[in-house]
Amino acid sequence: MAVQAVHIQGDAFLVCVTHSLSTEREEVMGLCIGEVDTQKVVHIHSVIILRRSDKRKDRVEISPEQLSAATTEADRLAEITGRPMRVVGWYHSHPHITVWPSHVDVRTQAMYQMMDVGFVGLIFSCFIEDKNTKTGRILYTCFQSVQAQKSSEYERIEVPLHVVPHNTIRKVCLESAVELPRILCQEEQDAYRRIHSLGHLDSITKIHNGSGE
């Protein structure tokens, strides 16, 4: 099933942008909750901000446990709304680099589509400066992966993305936004524990690292 278009609610889009701007040095990632209609249009109603198990400037990884938790959250929203909600996509940021997906992004997207052919990927390119106006820009795109005709590799196909205006922030999106500071704090605590567990650190380094916990 080739997705024809993606419609994302304005408040869900706001959460994605806020999350993307939360860190300039590494990529961030989350999952999109919504439904797919009979016209093969994906409707994104909310997003889930995920805690990163590995923080890098050019990639991000999420634990299987969090993917399972996202499915549980989608089931909860389905009961509340009475609509067939499920995890319909993922999003991640590209700080200081192009909005176009890397070969790793394209392969990751292809892997997700093996589980759900209607799965989509969103990328938010942030901390980009317009050379003419010297103002910051945020670029975004939506894509899927397809098998290249003359290669075993995958290539991206762009999916039209439409932001549906919303006058207010719904409770489900507000809850996601409120979770962001807590998740960022947890990530820093996890990083501290990993460094603190290294046996070769000297006492001065341990005291310095511990002062910021």
Task: State the predicted function of each range.
Residues 1-89, 93-213:
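MPN/JAMM (Mov34/JAB) isopeptidase/deubiquitinase module and associated MPN-bearing subunits/adaptors
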